[in-house]
């Protein structure tokens, strides 16, 4: 459980993570780690460490671009994808944003595709994939730079599942 959860201290551009219980269609209650305000390599890895430390049987991450990295953007996004693929504790990573798309293309050209790391072009696609893949008891981390607007994917996920009961 998350009884001992404490958000990471507010330093170095992170610390806005909020943990909450959410309920999707079919009464699927899960834990949301919502940190969709900011993302840089330090805060991204710290958020993933928080996700890894949870006791959930399935850990899912919705990850958007890490913006404003300049010349380091490709290498940082590539390193993140390699980390995600190699993380035995991670069930699923859903990627979105232009930087993630480019890194995903490079990664799959080199290593092939897997069901563990997937790319979705829009927040609506992210919401649909989450609705189809999330299960009771999962922990979902949502993390990305502000410009990716991952809160829209969450709003769509919660709106669609709570209003029609059938998901997207």
Predicted features along the sequence, with ranges:
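ATP-dependent carboxylate-amine ligase
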Residues: 1-168
């Amino acid at each position: 459980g998350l009884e001992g959860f404490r958000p990471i201290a507010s330093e170095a551009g992170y610390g806005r993570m909020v943990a909450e219980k959410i309920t999707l269609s079919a009464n699927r209650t899960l834990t949301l780690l919502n940190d969709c305000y900011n993302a840089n390599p330090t805060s991204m890895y710290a958020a993933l460490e928080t996700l890894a430390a949870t006791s959930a049987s399935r850990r899912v991450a919705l990850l958007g671009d890490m913006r404003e990295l300049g010349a380091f953007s490709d290498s940082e996004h590539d390193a993140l994808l390699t980390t995600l693929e190699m993380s035995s504790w991670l069930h699923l990573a859903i990627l979105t944003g232009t930087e993630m798309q480019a890194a995903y293309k490079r990664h799959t050209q080199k290593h092939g595709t897997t069901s563990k790391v997937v790319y979705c072009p829009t927040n609506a696609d992210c919401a649909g994939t989450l609705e189809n893949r999330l299960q009771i008891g999962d922990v979902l981390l949502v993390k990305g730079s502000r410009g990716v607007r991952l809160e829209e994917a969450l709003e769509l996920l919660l709106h669609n599942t709570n209003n029609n009961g059938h998901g997207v």
